[in-house]
Amino acid sequence: DTDTVEKMCRNLSRIMRYITNTAETTVTLREELDYVQKYLYCMKVRYQSSLNYSIDVDESLLDQPVPKLIIQPIVENAIKYGSDCEPPWTITISSTINQNSWQIDVTDTGPGFTEKAKEKINSDIMNAIRNPGMPALKINGLGTVNVFLRWKLFCKDDIIFRYGNTADSHGIVSIGRYFQTDAEEFEQA
C-alpha cells in the first residue's frame, strides 16, 4: 500500500533526525513519546497484525523533561523479548501519578522476565553503580542498564526504576521520579 510506505518513510526520516540531533539531549515527554509512536508505527508495519500497541499517558506529564531516547530502548526490548511467544503481541505505554511521584510503564504480553534475566539485570546495574564510568558489559544486554544509568544521572536521587513481571507474568519496565523528595526506589518485581 503506497500510503503505508509513504508514512513509514516519513517516520523513518523523522526518527533519524531525532536520533542524530545532538544539540538536544533533553526533550519533553511529549517529544519522546512522539518519537516512540513513530518507532512503533514502523514496527507495526513490519509485524503487521502480530503487533498491537497503545500509548496512554496523562496529559499533565507531557511537558516533563526527560533524556532523549530514554523510552525507546525499553520499547525495543519489549518487542524483542515480548515476541518470544505466539502473536499477537501487545506493547502498552501508560502512566501513573500519585501525590509525590509519576511513572511511565512499558508492558508487553510476552513471557515476562525469567529469574535468571532479572538476576543478570540486577547484577549489571549494581556493578554499574559500584563502578561508575563505562560498564564492562557485553554489547548485548546494555539497553536496560543504559536506561537506568542515564535516568539516574538525569534525576539524581529522585528515581523510580522497576523491572519485572506483571501479576499475569508479562514483562514490565517502569521509570519515573519523585516530585519533592530525595527518595530512591530501585526495585526488582
Regions flagged by a language model, labelled:
Residues 111, 179-180:
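Short, solvent-exposed loop/turn segments at secondary-structure junctions
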Residues 1-164:
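Two-component histidine phosphotransfer core
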Residues 170-179:
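Short C-terminal beta-strand
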Residues 185-189:
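Intrinsically disordered, low-complexity acidic/proline-/asparagine-rich linker or regulatory tail/stalk regions
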